[in-house]
């Protein structure tokens, strides 16, 4: 509770990056490559991570302007729709 209060007092908040339902989960969806390192500044719409499913590559974008705080999934790790890949802190 205190963390939430501190977050709102400073004006920043944490925003998750979630694997969307792409209809490709049956093809073995996995993180292929992180395009942005932890602690890096991003703008909403910047490509931050590449997912791969079979021969299909999908880039996911930063949901907000801010900073990538933590990557929660390693490269080559399998993922599924709804899984949180990373957290961003708003600027």
List each language-model region with its residue ranges.
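Acidic, low-complexity mobile loops and tails
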Residues: 1-47, 59, 65
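Short, conserved catalytic or interaction motifs in soluble domains
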Residues: 24, 36, 53, 73, ...
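Short flexible/disordered coil segments
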Residues: 37, 74-84
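Short hydrophobic beta/alpha edge segments that flank linear recognition/processing sites
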Residues: 42-61, 80-91
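Short, compositionally biased
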Residues: 57-70, 75
């Amino acid at each position: 509770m205190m963390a939430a209060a501190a977050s709102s007092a400073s004006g920043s908040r944490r925003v998750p990056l979630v694997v969307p339902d792409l209809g490709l989960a049956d093809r073995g969806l996995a993180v292929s490559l992180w395009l942005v390192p932890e602690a890096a500044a991003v703008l909403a719409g910047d490509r931050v991570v590449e997912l791969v499913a079979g021969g299909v590559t999908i880039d996911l974008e930063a949901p907000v302007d801010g900073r990538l705080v933590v990557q929660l999934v390693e490269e080559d790790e399998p993922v599924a729709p709804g899984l949180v890949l990373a957290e961003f802190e708003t600027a």
